[in-house]
């Protein structure tokens, strides 16, 4: 998700999302939210965040201050953090060997400007875990959402750019030790060719495990530091089979394995951005697939929850005002129990869109959209 340091606003279930009680069989009011900046325009119009329907806010982890947290509490909203895992490009200054290596043995250029990090770099990982722990220790927040937790790639567009990585010596050594597969003493290009053909299944499984193990450690830190906080993830919305299994084989995202550690999945089905501008139903199809894949129905009492983030602001293809209601309702349908809007920063100059969001949010607050 672009702009990891920006604010995220989300409308959650009344009261604390993490522990709000529900009665067996009672319908759930869908979480309703906005990503991309505190909506000062709402407050300036004379409405509080709660009057507009907002009762939870996500800030980039680096944006939290005592003053901002106090302001959020004064507004009677929940406070959550968005946490960048593998996209801290500045870290390459101190750790140049953390740059992902391509199949030819060269440093892979940042695809379309997106700079990923080698997931086996121990010092980088330790720094991110330390930052995660310090965030939870310093601020009494209600949860943290992982972001950019995937391999070196630029996938947030209609035509993704996803190079094969990482084939650094460290990754190849760890792969061999973990799997027992012996690679020949040969140039990286020859070794990577074997990994992408003869040993592809073992290579894919190993990479998935590397990224999942990060999630396990984040969960352990959360449990030890602030166990009442939710652990969520903003993630790629494709099914296992979309784009030749690219989410699995290129991005190294194993949703089922991560489900052992994650509380809330927030897929990013940006329909207009991803080539489905005239087909908002694509949103609910992707969310429906995710629910079936994870065994989530969107009923009270489930441990796992799905809160998609959907595109309402213009990014690439425009999203017309007349489409907003359907986009939000598609995102909020079961198995989802919530929906967020992407992105407030692109909405400030469009008051008609803001009001359309408000109308749908208030309608959703009094109804449960059916699945079809």
Residue ranges and their predicted role:
Residues 33-67, 138-143, 258-264, 331-339:
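Catalytic domains of carbohydrate-active enzymes, especially glycoside hydrolases
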Residues 45-101, 205-225:
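Aromatic-lined substrate-binding rim segments of carbohydrate-active enzymes
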Residues 35, 54-60, 111-129, 197-212, ...:
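The substrate-binding groove and active-site-proximal loops of carbohydrate-active enzymes
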Residues 225, 230-274, 319:
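Substrate-binding cleft/loops of secretory-pathway carbohydrate-active enzymes
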Residues 36-51, 124-135, 245-258, 319-330:
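Short, acidic/polar
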Residues 80, 145, 200-247, 301-315:
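Aromatic-lined carbohydrate-recognition surfaces of secreted/lumenal glycan-active proteins
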Residues 80-139, 156, 188-200:
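Active-site-adjacent "subsite" loops/lids of carbohydrate-active enzymes
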Residues 261-280, 290-371:
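Substrate-binding cleft of secreted/luminal carbohydrate-active enzymes
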């Amino acid at each position: 998700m672009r702009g990891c340091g920006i604010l995220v606003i989300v409308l959650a279930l009344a009261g604390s999302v993490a522990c709000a009680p529900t009665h067996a069989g009672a319908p759930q009011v869908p979480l309703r939210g906005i990503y991309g900046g505190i909506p000062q325009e709402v407050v300036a119009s004379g409405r509080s965040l709660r009057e507009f329907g907002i009762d939870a806010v996500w800030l980039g982890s680096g944006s939290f201050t005592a003053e901002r947290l106090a302001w959020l509490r004064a507004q009677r909203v929940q406070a959550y953090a968005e946490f960048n895992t593998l996209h801290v490009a500045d870290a390459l200054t101190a750790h140049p060997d953390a740059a992902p290596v391509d199949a030819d043995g060269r440093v892979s250029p940042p695809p379309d400007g997106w700079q990923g990090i080698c997931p086996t770099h121990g010092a980088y990982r330790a720094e991110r875990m330390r930052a995660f722990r310090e965030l939870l220790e310093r601020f009494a927040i209600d949860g943290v959402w992982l972001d950019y937790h995937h391999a070196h790639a630029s996938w947030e567009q209609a035509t993704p750019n996803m190079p094969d990585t990482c084939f650094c010596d460290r990754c190849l050594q760890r792969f061999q030790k973990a799997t027992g597969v012996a690679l020949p003493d040969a140039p990286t290009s020859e070794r990577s060719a074997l990994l992408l053909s003869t040993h592809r299944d073992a290579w894919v499984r190993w990479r998935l495990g590397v990224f999942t193990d990060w999630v396990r450690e984040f969960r352990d830190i959360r449990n030890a530091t602030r166990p009442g906080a939710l652990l969520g993830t903003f993630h790629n919305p494709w099914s296992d089979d979309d784009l030749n299994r690219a989410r699995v084989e290129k991005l190294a995202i194993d949703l089922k394995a991560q489900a052992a550690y994650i509380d809330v999945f927030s897929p990013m089905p940006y329909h207009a951005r991803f080539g489905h501008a005239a087909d908002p139903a694509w949103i609910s199809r992707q969310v429906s697939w995710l629910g079936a894949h994870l065994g989530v129905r969107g009923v009270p009492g489930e441990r796992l929850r799905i809160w998609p983030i959907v595109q309402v602001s213009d990014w690439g293809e425009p999203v017309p005002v007349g489409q907003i209601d359907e986009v939000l309702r598609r995102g909020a349908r079961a198995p989802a129990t919530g929906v967020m809007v992407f992105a407030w920063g692109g909405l400030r100059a469009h008051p008609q869109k803001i009001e359309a969001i408000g109308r749908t949010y208030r309608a959703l607050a009094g109804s449960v959209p059916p699945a079809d």
